[in-house]
């Protein structure tokens, strides 16, 4: 028994195409030591290319080893990242309440690893997948395979616009709009934006909030103050150049706290007083926001709530509480937390 995009495709088809026995195919897909590594990889590769995955749960049921899957697959870009760890906490807690377990894998922001994780989830017959895509993911066939095989998908934080799937996001646009409005209302006029690559929906939305706040308040939108910079190391490298300009900014809005803290320490090292000479606002409200001096003004994302909502949406799909094909979009509100890096 297997799950695949073509219901007529079987182990017999694989055996015929590769010139081996059905028993050899079966052993290879079960990772039997009786088959050479080279032969196993050849058979597994062919099976993957044809969307054929052995139904391990069904095999185990025949031997009365497990109950049907109630396992949710979770793909997280970086477990060590504060925001993602709070989302994971919300997912785990809500899954437990709803009677599900989770299988967690870290993509490390790598497309190739993300693909392998999806294959692993399919082989283990998870009942659904909650995922935030890796930064370098630009092709989505691995997600489409899940959808074709009837595995519900829910995206969080970084959503995949190439797939019609449910998603849970924070209100990135309004969070950015509110943050930049705060900077303007406290006297800032030249506000730099440090963002992620614009292929990511969150970066587009936060940039749009930044831009619209500036224009709404009658200020000039200076695109020379818009940079792709989304981590502390890059911020510490870029900021000296930005603050050395004759027309330097008097404020920074950063796409995350890590980047904002890189700006903060660089500005202080250069002799600027924060917030008197330059104001800084981040986006996360993680533990580091209160560990720096001065403490960071930032936008709170409420990751735990994002995780809870993602589980609820996925379970609604798994338990058929939503009509087939219905797409849910949940938006979690942000909150501006004003501290010492703004006036």
Describe each model-derived feature in a short phrase.
Residues 1-6, 10, 66-181, 185, ...:
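Alpha-helical recognition/docking segments in bacterial nutrient-uptake
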């Amino acid at each position: 028994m297997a799950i695949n995009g073509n219901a007529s495709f079987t182990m017999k088809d694989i055996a015929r195409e590769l010139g081996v026995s059905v028993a050899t195919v079966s052993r290879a897909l079960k990772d039997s030591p009786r088959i050479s590594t080279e032969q196993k990889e050849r058979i597994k590769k062919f099976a993957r290319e044809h969307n054929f995955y052995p139904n391990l749960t069904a095999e185990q049921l025949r031997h009365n080893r497990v109950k049907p899957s109630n396992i949710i697959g979770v793909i997280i870009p970086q477990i060590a990242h504060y925001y993602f760890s709070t989302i994971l906490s919300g997912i785990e807690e809500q899954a437990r309440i709803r009677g599900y377990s989770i299988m967690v894998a870290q993509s490390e922001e790598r497309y190739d690893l993300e693909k392998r994780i999806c294959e692993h989830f399919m082989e283990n017959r998870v009942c659904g997948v909650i995922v935030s895509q890796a930064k370098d993911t630009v092709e989505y066939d691995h997600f489409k395979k899940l959808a074709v095989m009837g595995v519900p998908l829910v995206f969080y934080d970084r959503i995949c616009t190439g797939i019609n799937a449910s998603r849970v996001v924070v209100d990135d646009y309004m969070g950015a709009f509110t943050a930049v409005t705060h900077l303007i209302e406290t006297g800032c006029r030249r506000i730099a934006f440090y963002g992620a690559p614009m292929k990511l929906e969150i970066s587009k939305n936060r940039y749009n909030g930044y831009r619209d706040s500036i224009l709404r308040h009658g200020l000039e939108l200076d695109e020379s103050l818009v940079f792709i910079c989304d981590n502390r190391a890059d911020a510490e490298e870029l900021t000296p150049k930005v603050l050395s300009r004759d027309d330097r900014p008097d404020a920074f809005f950063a796409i995350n706290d890590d980047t904002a803290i890189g700006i903060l320490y660089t500005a202080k090292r250069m002799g600027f007083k924060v917030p008197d000479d330059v104001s800084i606002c981040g986006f996360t409200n993680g533990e580091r926001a209160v560990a720096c001096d001065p403490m960071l003004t930032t936008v709170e994302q409420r990751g735990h709530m994002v995780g809870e909502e993602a589980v609820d949406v996925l379970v609604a799909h798994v338990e058929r509480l939503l009509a087939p094909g219905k797409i849910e979009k949940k938006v979690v509100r942000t909150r501006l937390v004003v501290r010492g890096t703004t006036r």
